[in-house]
A protein has these predicted regions:
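Feature captures hydrophobic
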Residues: 1-150
Length: 150
């Protein structure tokens, strides 16, 4: 397997990414995600979301979701916006719309969720994921994407 860095992440598919997250210690993920590589890694992950979106599972779902990823350089938080409407998913790192759901989590939790390495419902129940807004939507978000398993 490869190192946990933006270049290696950009060159592997979703399943290999899931295996990489699973094989990398949380402390190493936290270290990398607190540094200069953070934006590239987050951009790579979010840019893949539309390709993993399952319109067949979304049905008539119309939603704006804000993902607040904490633990950035200097204690910063990065916010990405996922818009699900008309059977499609779009993503931006410049949120412009009012969210139906806003989820806040640290980068290790986020990467585990998007790589299938963690149970989002359990993470919510234990406070690792904080959700504000439509909690019914929060419970369904993972089902809207074809999340790889390591």
């Amino acid at each position: 397997m490869t190192d946990f860095n933006p270049e290696s992440i950009a060159s592997i598919g979703p399943k290999e990414f899931a295996q990489l997250v699973k094989a990398t210690p949380d402390s190493k993920i936290a270290e990398v995600m607190a540094g200069d590589s953070r934006a590239k890694i987050l951009d790579e992950v979010f840019n893949r979301m539309p390709t993993l979106f399952r319109a067949d599972r979304a049905g008539a779902t119309q939603a704006v979701i804000h993902w607040n990823i904490t633990g950035g350089p200097g204690g910063s938080t990065d916010t990405y916006e996922t818009v699900i409407e008309n059977g499609a998913c779009t993503v931006t790192s410049h949120p412009a719309r009012e969210p139906k759901l806003a989820m806040t989590m640290d980068p290790v939790t986020f990467l585990k969720v998007v790589s299938g390495g963690g149970n989002p419902m359990m993470m919510f129940m234990t406070g690792k994921i904080k959700a504000k807004g439509d909690l019914g939507l929060a419970a369904q978000v993972a089902k809207l994407f074809d999340i790889p398993k390591a």
